[in-house]
């Protein structure tokens, strides 16, 4: 019995080993598989599923029926988290729906209230159909020009109005001498204030010749009638009174400033007479050399074209075109100085770097009937209101019109809108009547 029992147990153990070797290895039990099995037990159709008789023997077949998905996808969030997410989503939706129409309404209101602004456009070239180019004037230039012209006419207190180069010739001189005097005044005016130029011109009119000034040249019937009236009455036709102890000028003498006296005077003497102007040493050389050229090449009269005038030493485009207008009455170009160059750029008419560029730009579109007056117009504006430093925008007629792109807004008028206070300066530029002209300088 014992021997048979030992044989049976040994046989059973060997049989178990063989079966164990032939059967597949048991599947490893993990946390996810255990959770899946647990969830499978709570499935909706768990009670209706028939038990497989082989389930107990083969555990792997039951696990393969469960989808291998992440636990976060199977489990529903807790009530608190679900409520928080739902509320935040609702809040986001409500905020987005609340803000969107507000933005749209604001945009619509802005579009309705906004008015199209007039664009300020400078002078520009426009190509025509035939391939040629024309220059269109800046926008609103005529409105700016009209306002400034009216303002200057109502208050002509700038130094250029009474002491500009066009006003400094001797009224009783011959036309040839007056043209020469205008040229000399322009040559002296470079880098010099009008008041200083007027004083230097007065010295040349009265002190240039040696041994006294020559007798006056009577060239008009008006002058002859004045002399005849003086001879009959035994006294001057127009009585003059001394001012500040200075006796009035004697109208019986002509100016000493003429070509012949400039040629005869020594450079040292001429330099002392014009010593108040800027760069007087260079100007002395230029005037002496120009006088020789006028005598030798132009029959003792100044040239009659801008190109010929610019051949004279010290004479540039500005002087040439101003001299053509004042001396010959020919307006062939615009005299552009620093005031014209600066102010037109402040207005946005163009973007130029030099006065010569400004001249060419203005001449391309400005009507020719304004070429002569624009210099005096803008120089006076630059001397009284639109100053190089410390512009008085409150005193300008363009204030508040939105026409000047460089206006300093909020500036109150410094003189109640009446321009600058007047200061009287007596400069004897003796006319035929012998009355000294009263010059007005704005402080």
Swiss-Prot record:
On the tree of life, the source organism's domain of life is Eukaryota
Instruction: Identify the residues that the record assigns to the HhH domain, covering every copy.
Output: 297-321
For the region Disordered, give the residue spans: 1-126
Q: Which UniProt keywords apply?
A: 4Fe-4S, DNA damage, DNA repair, Glycosidase, Hydrolase, Iron, Iron-sulfur, Lyase, Metal-binding, Mitochondrion, Nucleus, Transit peptide
List site positions: Important for catalytic activity. 337
Q: Give the compositionally biased regions (Basic and acidic residues).
A: 99-114
Quote the record's binding site residues for [4Fe-4S] cluster.
Answer: 386, 393, 396, 404
- What is its cofactor? [4Fe-4S] cluster
Any GO CC annotation of this UniProt entry: nucleus
Q: What is this protein called?
A: Endonuclease III homolog
Its organism's taxonomic lineage begins at: Eukaryota, Fungi, Dikarya, Ascomycota, Pezizomycotina
Q: Which gene encodes it?
A: nth1
